[in-house]
Amino acid sequence: MTAGSGVVHSELPTDDFLRVGGRMHGFQLWVNLPASAKMIPPRYQGFDAQELRRVALGNGGEVRIVAGTVMGVTGAVQTTSPMTYAHVVMRADEEVTWEVGDGHTALVHVFDGALSANGHTGRSGQMMVFERSSGTIVLRTERGANGIDAVAESAAAAGEHGVVAQALLLGGQPLGEPVVRYGPFVMNTRDEIVQAFRDYEEGTLVRGR
């Protein structure tokens, strides 16, 4: 979803999930728009899981690419500035290579299991932040690679699906602009925030319908 000049929305589970129940997890990522694009018309891009473009790994793992390019495959989501958003699902003894753009911020957020990224250990709940320079980030799940016992332990506890690690690859070009956030609004100046609240209260926030 691109909020742009303004959008009012709600987020709910599917009817089937509400009826049957269970456990689900997800990530909500806020990406700042450049000042020049703050007031573009709002839009929504929806994709089912099976529509995401993927790269198959050697032992049954995969990279699900939402936006940007990883291992030669480009995601379907269109963005206003260059960025990468991918879901990595790795089994034992697999490797993912990610070419990071010059000057881009690059993050690897591990949310299940453990892996190594350029030789650094990443365990569940940890985020690795890399220097803003072009280059290659290599993710591995080799058993005991670089003395990483956590990867070997994850492999031993992988269970029937054999998944050793899951992580998000997140990267983008820094905008270098001021950020002012209050409530649900993110703008560049305090005056713009005040105007956004005024528009909402007056019912003129949502434009470009």
Summary of predicted features, one role per range:
Residues 1-209:
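Jelly-roll (double-stranded beta-helix
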